[in-house]
């Protein structure tokens, strides 16, 4: 009988486990997250590239052949990069190349078209998670790692790999939240100068995020919340130099965020309303806003305007993420139980202070969900959600809890694991639809 080398099942399992530890190892988060990011992006890229033809909508081809009949153009001659230019990205690319030529282009973030780039906010989210939950214990490290890993497979899918605003918005918004959380930690250790400088830097980043996507203005809730926190001190102790200086920094930060929305509107006002031509209708509004006007006129965006029978499938498509956003916002309010769950071995005061950010972030996320449900094209919540970290933390916490429970109860089915699998499947299916220029956008 000839001798054969047979790989036993146990050996195969050990090899698989070894490979898994290389790819997913919370002890080496930066390397592991970078590998996961590269693999997932490569898969999304491959799916989009192999989609055949020009797509259902051929608008992308106008970027290359604005005056040519497409019937005599071989689809194989189109650059592969154009497969990533779908839906709103056509506006982004055109504005980046030619400037803001048409009125409706002002609906798309002014900041992003001045800096087209593929940016990842995964590593920043990991550092933000460490600020909030700590990174000393195994449970804390796992939570932070899983949160960042979930951001990689965000339901935004192909939009985070295409010339859209979502990737840059996520980077700027999460970076702003990271600096904001760092300022809170500095406040807990009485480093006032560092606290104020980081708070203003956070405002600058959130303002830049607002210039990319208008929903970034919700970040102003953090500063409004901080301002309200000063009222009890003023009422009980009166005005002091420390309170006045703190309030001044907070108000200045809030004004900086508002500039992210106001400056593009001012530029548009000068372009359309301060000329010899007949002014546009919105120029005479009490608060002129080209953004609001073009959203209403060209996309029919407004309160309950999307609530029509043909859009029911889009509401159903958005419901899982809407439910996840609201559920995680409610979870964040349960601060005592959350603190006890992740603050093992006696968390220090600074960590407890940082975790008080969770209710503030819950307000922002809940507002986003309500606005998406009542006033937006509801399906875009699947990509808008990518820049908000709270639901990543919630889902990561549920994964850890479900895994722990499965070990004690031998329960195989985990709702959180099913949710993650559904997000991954949706991301792959959406990549096919995106590459073929098919809805949803």
Swiss-Prot record:
Pfam family for this entry, one: Mannosyl_trans2
Pathway: Glycolipid biosynthesis; glycosylphosphatidylinositol-anchor biosynthesis
Transmembrane domains' residue ranges: 4-24, 35-55, 115-135, 143-163, 165-185, 199-223, 249-269, 306-326, 361-381, 418-438
Disulfide bonds: none
A Gene Ontology molecular function term of the record: mannosyltransferase activity
Enzyme Commission no: 2.4.1.-
Keywords: Endoplasmic reticulum, Glycosyltransferase, GPI-anchor biosynthesis, Membrane, Transferase, Transmembrane, Transmembrane helix
Protein name per the record: GPI mannosyltransferase 2
Signal peptide, first to last residue: none
Membrane topology classification: Multi-pass membrane protein
Predominant location: endoplasmic reticulum
Compartment annotation: Endoplasmic reticulum membrane
Gene that produces this protein: gpi18
Described purpose of this protein according to its UniProt entry: Mannosyltransferase involved in glycosylphosphatidylinositol-anchor biosynthesis. Transfers the second mannose to the glycosylphosphatidylinositol during GPI precursor assembly.
Lineage: Eukaryota, Fungi, Dikarya, Ascomycota, Pezizomycotina
Family: Belongs to the PIGV family.
Gene Ontology terms: cellular component: endoplasmic reticulum membrane; mannosyltransferase complex
Alphabetical GO biological process terms: GPI anchor biosynthetic process
């Amino acid at each position: 009988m000839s001798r054969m080398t047979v790989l036993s099942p146990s050996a195969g399992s050990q090899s698989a486990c070894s490979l898994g530890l290389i790819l997913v190892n919370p002890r080496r988060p930066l390397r592991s997250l970078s590998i996961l990011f590269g693999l997932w992006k490569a898969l999304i890229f491959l799916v989009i590239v192999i989609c055949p033809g020009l797509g259902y909508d051929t608008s992308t081809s106008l970027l290359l052949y604005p005056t040519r009949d497409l019937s005599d153009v071989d689809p194989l001659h189109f650059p592969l990069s154009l497969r990533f230019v779908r839906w709103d990205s056509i506006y982004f690319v055109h504005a980046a190349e030619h400037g803001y030529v048409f009125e409706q282009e002002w609906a798309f973030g002014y900041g992003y078209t001045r800096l087209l780039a593929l940016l990842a906010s995964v590593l920043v989210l990991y550092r933000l998670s460490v600020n909030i939950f700590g990174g000393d214990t195994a449970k804390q490290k796992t939570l932070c790692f899983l949160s960042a890993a979930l951001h990689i497979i965000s339901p935004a899918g192909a939009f985070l790999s295409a010339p859209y605003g979502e990737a840059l918005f996520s980077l700027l918004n999460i970076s702003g939240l990271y600096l904001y959380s760092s300022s809170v930690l500095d406040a807990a250790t009485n480093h006032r100068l560092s606290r104020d400088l980081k708070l203003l830097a956070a405002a600058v980043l959130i303002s830049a995020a607002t210039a990319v996507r208008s929903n970034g203005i919700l970040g102003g809730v953090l500063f409004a919340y901080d301002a309200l926190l000063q009222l009890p001190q003023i009422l009980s102790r009166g005005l002091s130099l420390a309170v006045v200086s703190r309030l001044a920094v907070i108000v200045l930060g809030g004004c900086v965020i508002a500039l992210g929305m106001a400056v593009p509107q001012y530029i548009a006002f000068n372009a359309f309303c301060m000329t010899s031509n007949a002014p546009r209708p919105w120029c005479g509004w009490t608060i002129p806003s080209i953004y609001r006007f073009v959203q209403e006129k060209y996309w029919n965006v407004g309160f309950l305007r999307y609530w029509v029978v043909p859009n029911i499938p889009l509401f159903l498509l958005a419901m899982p993420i809407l439910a996840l956003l609201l559920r995680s916002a409610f979870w964040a309010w349960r601060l005592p139980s959350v603190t006890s769950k992740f603050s093992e071995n006696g968390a220090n005061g600074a960590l407890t202070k940082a975790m008080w950010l969770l209710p503030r972030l819950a307000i922002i996320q809940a507002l986003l969900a309500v606005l998406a449900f009542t006033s937006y094209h509801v399906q875009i919540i699947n990509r808008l959600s990518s820049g908000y970290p709270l639901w990543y933390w919630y889902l990561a916490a549920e994964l850890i809890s479900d895994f722990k429970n499965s070990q004690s109860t031998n329960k195989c089915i985990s709702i959180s694991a099913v949710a993650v699998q559904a997000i991954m499947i949706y991301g792959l299916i959406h990549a096919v639809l995106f590459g073929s220029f098919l809805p949803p956008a």
